[in-house]
Amino acid sequence: MRILFVAAEAAPLAKVGGMGDVVGSLPKVLRRMGHDVRIFMPYYGFLPDKVEIPKDPIWIGHAMFQTFHVYETVLPGSDVPLYLFGHPCFNPRRIYYGEDEDWRFTFFANGAAEFAWNYWKPQIIHCHDWHTGMIPVWMHQDPDITTVFTIHNLAYQGPWRWRLEQITWCPWYMQGHNTMAAALQYADRVNTVSPTYAEQIKTPEYGEKLEGLLSFISGKLSGILNGIDTELFDPSSDRALAQNYTADTLERRRANKIALQEELGLEVNSGAFLVGMVSRLVEQKGLDLLIQILDRFLAYTDSQFVLLGTGDRYYETQMWQIASRFPGRCSVQLLYSDVLSRRIYGGADAFIMPSRFEPCGISQMIALRYGCVPIVRRTGGLVDTVSHHNPEQQTGTGYCFDRYEPLDFYTCLVRAWEGYRYKREWHALQQRGMREDFSWTKSALAYNALYNSIYGLPPETMPNPSPTLVPAVT
């Protein structure tokens, strides 16, 4: 099938959250399966620093009383064609900024629709999050193009101002809706990035005021778990690590722990229980829980803690203060570093994700891949990826708690600390996690079945592509 991915992010070129990982990884696997997949995203001002882009556009289009240019390149490390939507409104060197995001991304979505109608006509437009929410509305009347809409985070639904309704051909009965709601109503298929999250968003607790609409469209709503790039995240070959290792050579992992302790100024003690966290410092990620229990945990145990990430100034300040009270045992790195994150995955004993909600989560899958035992709250994709350790039956891949309460999180963390003392059982726990399959191939098969369902094909039907290019309109 001819499939056009339309999104605001695509790793490794532009990434803020998990959407960038999906758009940067899934098309590569789908192309290997035989689909003709291409990506359409904004031409941000920082992209020329990361990829070679031709000076001349392949097509010039018009949308919302504006002229835009489309440039063609290739997603780095792949053969996936990448179309870049060029307009001065996307020239600044950040992805998200200012108060006009609704106008900019609706304009971008309109440009993608014009491109699909007039230059390269796909069979399916795969839209990602609110930035592309109007595309299913516009495509609803086109019998030749169907749409799939993926919810990466329902909490971000897209603003809507009255002036947009005058220039986007919005149906009168949708005036005042946000672009996420528009996509939910008009897309042929809707999916979230984990099965559990697909069920949770139909409830008031997680539905972000759209639970009624989501329940109404439940017949076309499903959940497909994200994957990770198992070649990129591979402890047996990761150059960021001091020592590579596999599930069968876990004893080599000790060198990474010592190297991490030395790098971050922690006491060098291979026997200490080292807990890591790589996260945005926002409430969604459970920072309020962590702040309430970390002092007590470090005082009660001989553990160490390392945090990597940036976010709300309040949480940054609180974490700095805790680190100052435990020199040599708590390291807070308020920055983004892909290399350091890999060293934390490869050197820490456990990895915490006490999220208030989590559509999918990728960090816990990377942690499992590296033998870093996850300690998570059972919500969203964390339910689908981490199973609770049962020491008697020797099952499970991590430690889990249910209620979003400090005591529950603290109790779970202490249980993991106690479990770490039983080295044989702990190594078996690490090995079970490292042998889990979170490859994108598994996810791509599920998306292939989703695409097939639109056309009434059996889920296992594999593509027989016959790509066509509609001549450019000049």
Swiss-Prot record:
Gene3D superfamilies: Glycogen Phosphorylase B. Synthesizes alpha-1,4-glucan chains using ADP-glucose. It comes from Thermosynechococcus vestitus (strain NIES-2133 / IAM M-273 / BP-1). ADP-alpha-D-glucose binds at residue 15. Belongs to the glycosyltransferase 1 family. Bacterial/plant glycogen synthase subfamily. It holds the Pfam family Glycos_transf_1. InterPro entries: Glyco_trans_1, GS/SS, Starch_synth_cat_dom. The keyword Glycosyltransferase applies. It comes from the Bacteria. Pathway: Glycan biosynthesis; glycogen biosynthesis. The keyword Thylakoid does not apply. Keywords: Glycogen biosynthesis, Glycosyltransferase, Transferase. One of its GO terms (biological process) is glycogen biosynthetic process. It is an enzyme of class 2 (transferase). Its EC number is 2.4.1.21. PANTHER family: ALPHA AMYLASE DOMAIN-CONTAINING PROTEIN, GRANULE-BOUND STARCH SYNTHASE 1, CHLOROPLASTIC/AMYLOPLASTIC. It catalyses: [(1->4)-alpha-D-glucosyl](n) + ADP-alpha-D-glucose = [(1->4)-alpha-D-glucosyl](n+1) + ADP + H(+). GO terms for molecular function: alpha-1,4-glucan glucosyltransferase (ADP-glucose donor) activity; alpha-1,4-glucan glucosyltransferase (UDP-glucose donor) activity. This is Glycogen synthase.
